[in-house]
Each structure stands twice: as structure tokens, then as C-alpha cells.
Amino acid sequence: MDYAICPRTKLNGFRTTLNVSPWLVGSLTTMAVRKPTAIQKACIPEILKGRDCIGGSRTGSGKTIAFAVPILQKWAQDPFGIFAVVLTPTRELALQIYEQIKAISAPQSMKPLLITGGTDMRSQALALSQRPHVVIATPGRLADHINTSGEDTVCGLKRVRMVVLDEADRLLAPGPGSMLPDVETCLSALPPSSERQTLLFTATLTPEVRALKSMPRAENKPPVFVTEISTENNGAIPPTLKQTYLKVPMTHREAFLHVLLSTERNSTKPAIIFCNHTKTADLLERMLRRLSHRVTSLHSLLPQSERNSNLARFRASAARILVATDVASRGLDIPSVSLVINFDVPRNPDDYVHRVGRTARAGRHGEAVTLVGQRDVQLVLAIEERVERRMEEWSEEGVSIEGRVVRGGVLKEVGEAKREASGEIEEGRDVLGRKRNKLKKVR
């Protein structure tokens, strides 16, 4: 099909307002992406002009397309490898970006490459040495290749034209567990900032991100383009997101969760349950499975192949519930999610913002329910101050969660399921009851 003359393509806002190449417009149209979002309108023209960019916009606003489209348009004008590097904090987000770039670039012979932990280093090194056009990576694994895989493998990075730091606030955050040393290793293998185009995207413009605006620049480079469109710095929780809390006794939190998932309003909703710890997520998945919920999980104790498989099952609605740690709180776009439950109240209000951002995306409606114990009140108050909105007490007509918990043997049923799940973990069995070696955390 000739995209330049396709009537549907002519009507696409990316062509009429942003001067995006016809082949890209046709690809976006095929994906049912016809109207650019605010962050895309602001950033795409400036990136095409060659300007460095700091783009701030809340979750679900289309930041990936905002950098992927200009990268692919510039690459098509001068296709060589390695043209661009995209760094992002989690494997799941890297996979999602890889799949989006692969889909958008389908009409061309563009080769993206995914570089993340949990997979074979040697096969990755071979693929990296073959000069893919766009590398999408987590900083830790790409830094490993830079440090250990040899000059022949990583020399292509020295010609990179564009680099993206996606979820830049997380990548640049200092402190324990910081990714910043690995990010610096990655950037040191690329051309200097004066010879490349640097794009930063985030839902939260932190001081570390803002500071990059005023860094010294080469004389031949225009000023950094900075846009902040309804970011989550100013409490911009989508108006379509309903925030509620449910008071729970600490000793019966699991029973309240089971009943909450089973109410008439919630029993069919695709839901993500967030926990603060991997052990909690592992236990909850096993327990909920015994209580006949269609459930899977996503956390760092799982092998990468299982993480990918579980996420694919949830996307395909083979599982209705995803139990996850904050590894799933950033960037993942699963449009069907209409319910987010905070089983544990996050310690950091920013983590709350990213968690609830998994629902009510792109104008859709969603609900976030936070289970609140007596010790969680101060955390909830800090969250409300951060998002500049009060949570409402959860309610459903004709439903008393507490009443259902104390009646009908729910406490006994949930208690037995929890004990069986704990025993399974102690015996070293997987969620299907099969004996296997003790899971180890992998980078």
C-alpha cells in the first residue's frame, strides 16, 4: 500500500500537524494511532529539528511514541547501526518498548535489539556485534557488555546518534540501589553529548532531571527543549481515576483482599495487586490460586522467561489478576486494567503515583483501592498531600466487606489457603506445586 496516497493516512494527525513521514503515519494508522497526544505534539517537531529534549508527562500519555517516531524517521533518512540506544529501568518496560518500536517500524527493514538481564550474555553479545539499528536496554546488562564483552562487541555504540533515558527520574536517582553508575557506564561508551541527541522522558521531573537543562552545552547545539505537560509533579492524577481506601485489620488483610476481588463489581475486572516485597507477592499468588482466582505474578524472584510468560498471560486475559512488586509499576501499558489494589501501602508517595498509573490510562476510567491498616494512616496522608486529592472510603451498594469476611467461613478458607501456600514455598515448589531448585534473584 502506498501510504502517501492512502485516504486514512491523509487524515492522520501525525501527518497533518507534525509532518511525520508517510510510511510512519501509515504504520501508526494500522495500529489505530491517529491523533497525537499533547506530549507527542510538543516533542516530535522539536526532536526532528535535532534538539535535545526533556519531556515530562504523566503515565499513559504516549511518551514512547513521542521518542520512537522521530528516532525512526531520522534513522530512515540515514539508516545505519547502531543509530539509537534506549535505556529504561525494568526488563518488562524494555520489552514493551522493543515490541512497540518493532511494530511501528514494520514497513522497514529496521533491526531493534533487546538487551536485558536474565538471558544469555553470549547470544546478546553476538547480536550486539552485528550492529542492530536500535538497542533497547536496561542499564545493568548493557553496562555488563561494555565492561566484559570486548571492543568488537560494543564498538558500534561509538557512532550512536540518539540516546533516550526513559523513566529518567528512576535512572538518575541517587542513593542505595541507584542505577546511576550503570547509566554513566553506558553513556561513557557513546559519543559525547555534543555529538549526539539526548532525550529524557519521565512522569516525574525530579531535581536530578531538571538539573540537566542548565548543564554546559556545545556552541553548535540549540537549547534543550523542556516541556512539562500535566506531569505527576503537580499531583496530576487523571480525573478518570477513582481513588479509594479500605480499612483492614492487619491480621485479616488477605481475607479482605479475597472478598474485595470477589464482589459483584470487581469479580470480572482485570486487576493488578501491588505488594512492597517479593515474598508477599509470591505468597499472595499461591494463596489466591487456591481460592480459585485466575492469577499470575511479576517480581524479581522469578526467572526472566517466567516473568515474560506471566506478563503475556495477563495481557492476553488468560489471567485476570497480576500480583506484582514495583517492578510492574512503571511504564507498563496494559489498557484492559481497570482496578489497581495496593495490598501494601507504598512507603514513597511517588511509588503510589506510578502504581495507580497502571489504570485510567489514555482517558479510560479506573479505580485504585488501598488497603489501610492502623499503622498506615500517616503514609496515606503523605500520598494525599502528594497527589493533592483525598481518597474516598471504598463502598459498593449492598456490600459489606467486613460482614462477608466474618460470615460463611471466609476466614477459615483463606487461612487454610495461606497455610498451604506457605508450606509450598518452604518445600521449594513452584506455583503449580512442582519441585524445583530454590529461586535466586537474577540481575
Curated annotation (Swiss-Prot):
GO terms for molecular function: ATP binding; ATP hydrolysis activity; RNA binding; RNA helicase activity. A motif (DEAD box) lies at residues 166-169. ATP binds at S57, R58, T59, G60, S61, G62, K63, T64. Gene3D superfamilies: P-loop containing nucleotide triphosphate hydrolases (3.40.50.300). The Q motif is unique to and characteristic of the DEAD box family of RNA helicases and controls ATP binding and hydrolysis. ATP-binding RNA helicase involved in 40S ribosomal subunit biogenesis and is required for the normal formation of 18S rRNAs through pre-rRNA processing at A0, A1 and A2 sites. Required for vegetative growth. This is ATP-dependent RNA helicase dbp8. It comes from Aspergillus oryzae (strain ATCC 42149 / RIB 40). The gene is dbp8.
